[in-house]
Swiss-Prot record:
InterPro entries: Pept_tRNA_hydro, Pept_tRNA_hydro_CS, Pept_tRNA_hydro_sf. The keyword Cytoplasm applies. It catalyses: an N-acyl-L-alpha-aminoacyl-tRNA + H2O = an N-acyl-L-amino acid + a tRNA + H(+). It comes from Corynebacterium glutamicum (strain ATCC 13032 / DSM 20300 / JCM 1318 / BCRC 11384 / CCUG 27702 / LMG 3730 / NBRC 12168 / NCIMB 10025 / NRRL B-2784 / 534). It comes from the Bacteria. TRNA binds at Y18, F65, N67, N113. This is Peptidyl-tRNA hydrolase 1.
Length: 177
């Protein structure tokens, strides 16, 4: 990592309709990181995001829909002069069991449109991805429908634990530089 801050972007969809859905788990992690530092989000108009500036860290929640996440992420990188190597994108991941949390650098998008948009806008796949396992949809349910559904009651109880685990990984990554 260079001297620029680490940019952590929690992916999700804007608006009350999507609160508590699987696709918005990235927002949960962003909020956990900010609450740990007693910070708060404010609107960053240039990038159309809500951001919190913390020591060595900028946490963001795009105000765009998931499939267009790359544009605000690129705007933040340009504004704060952050290279893709200093970006962590937090996203829902169908290919991981529910409750699993995994940090990886580079690699594919696993069909995730928010990651596709980010890779296209940044011009590289070489940024960090913090994958939040939401599991596969039941039966023959369409994955696109599954990610837009709210978590079940039992799952909902585990979201704070997952968000805390993910925030721990970000803090460890920040400390290791």
């Amino acid at each position: 990592m260079n001297n620029s801050p680490l940019l952590v972007v929690g992916l999700g969809n804007p608006g009350p309709k999507y609160v508590g859905t699987r696709h918005n788990i990235g927002f949960e992690v962003a909020e956990e990181l900010v609450s740990r530092s007693f910070g708060s989000f404010s609107v960053h108009k240039r990038s159309n995001t809500d951001i919190a500036q913390l020591p060595g860290l900028i946490v963001a929640k795009p105000r765009s829909f998931m499939n267009l996440s790359g544009t605000p992420i690129r705007a933040l990188c340009d504004f704060f002069k952050i290279s893709p190597a200093n970006v962590i994108v937090v996203h829902d991941e169908l290919e991981l069991d529910f409750g699993s949390v995994k940090l990886r650098q580079g690699g594919g998008d696993h069909g995730h449109n928010g990651l596709k948009s980010t890779s296209k806008s940044l011009g590289t796949k070489d940024y960090w991805k913090l994958s939040m396992g939401i599991g596969r949809p039941p039966g023959r349910m369409d994955p696109a429908s599954f990610v837009l559904k709210p978590f079940g009651k039992q799952e909902l109880a585990d979201i704070p634990i997952m968000a805390a685990d993910a925030a721990d990984l970000v803090e460890k990554h920040l400390q290791q530089g």
